[in-house]
Amino acid sequence: MDLLTDPRKRRWLGWGSLAVVFLLVNVHRLSTAVLSERLTTDFAISAAQLGTLHASFFVVYALVQIPTGVLADRYGPRVVGATGAVVLSAGAIAFTLSDGYLVAFLSRALVGLGSGVIFITMLRFCANWYRVDEFGTMAGLTAGIAGLGAIVATTPLAVAVSRFGWRPTVFALAVLGFLAGVAVFALARSSPADAGLDPIENVPEQPSVSLAETAGYLRELLTDREQWLLAVIFFSGMGTILTIIGLWGVPYLVVVHGLSVTAASYYTLLGSVGILIGAPTVGWVSDRIGRRLLPMVVGLGAFALTLAVIPIVGTPPLPVVALTYFLVGFSLGSVMLSLPIIKEEYPPEASGVATATVNGAGFFGAAVLPAVMGLALDRYRTGDVVAGAVVYTEFGYRVAFAITTIAVAVAFLCSLRLFVRE
């Protein structure tokens, strides 16, 4: 069968199996928004504990990025990807069996541990199977899967949870994860040579790298000024996108615009659609024009200007909010260009650890920025409680969104610095 013997076709089977796992990663990552009420009731936890439960995923996810890069370079995407799928699914099953906060917290962290290896593994797979001028497109397409997962984590997940309950629904996701892990082990070979196939023209051979060589590349990365600028871009950009779409985007609409939670979720759904469209589109454009920094600078500048509408106006018309949320998601494409930029600065055998250092910064941003926005909201809250929820103010949200706007503006300035030096 050509599908198995033609390396240009076979690579899509491997990428597709990893993509299924990555979709599940993003469903688990954003599921707490839909599950929040049930988790609060089942585990008898406060809002602060719920926030900590949510953050446990991101903290562990961020911490494993550099080790994942080392492992992906050393052992290849087949072993690391399949192991990650098994670990995150085991964590999901443990989560469904949790009878208290501590077990739930540790289970959620285990999901983050397994999930944390998948994206870097996919990038390593793409480096092994796709040409350099295809990598930006593939990185964007891979990020687009995150948008699809975010969509599944909204209304579809809510319907499933409402009909079957949250524990059976999460258990079903875990079973699917185990099956996807088997598919990864069977199909996602480390390279065409590893699959017994002819090499793909213009795809550089990815030699195995020793731990000593990896340590050398890591030391070089930690002293690389360009890497730190890209890390700031990813911290600010990815952190802002996940914070708005994954957490504060809905409460802002509920408090400031008076929408129901269900109605507000449609706006964050637009953000997820923006991710689905923007990431592969910007990656494709970057590959076609052979430029990385130009679309990054333009995209981040538009991101900052778009986001500034909320802190400046406070209560913009809902169609403007809808467009803002969509463009926030679409901007992920520009943020994602950080990864092919850093990958292309280092030898092929260092692609895993190089992309991991930048990618990890994004998920530290996803853990830090929600908390900083929360501090701003607490500073300006009224002190009233309605239906068990703390009442925040429009001014508090303006300050909170100003924080993310400043973060994105800093990312824009970092990209401009890189562009000028190009």
Predicted regions, residues:
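Cytoplasmic helix-loop-helix junction between adjacent transmembrane helices
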Residues: F105-L148
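Conserved MFS/SLC helix-loop-helix module at the cytosolic interface between two early adjacent transmembrane helices
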Residues: L63-L102
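Extracytoplasmic gate region of multi-pass secondary transporters
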Residues: T32-A33, R219-G283, P370, G374
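Helix-breaking motifs and short loop linkers at transmembrane-helix boundaries and internal kinks
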Residues: H28, A44, G76, A94-V103, ...
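Flexible cytoplasmic inter-helical loops of multi-pass small-molecule transporters
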Residues: A186-G216, E422
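Cytoplasmic membrane-interface "Motif A"-like loop-to-helix N-cap segments
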Residues: R74-A85, D287-G301
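Helix-loop-helix hairpin linking two adjacent transmembrane segments in secondary transporters
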Residues: T137, L141-A195
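C-terminal ends and interior cores of transmembrane alpha-helices
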Residues: V86-D99, G301-T315
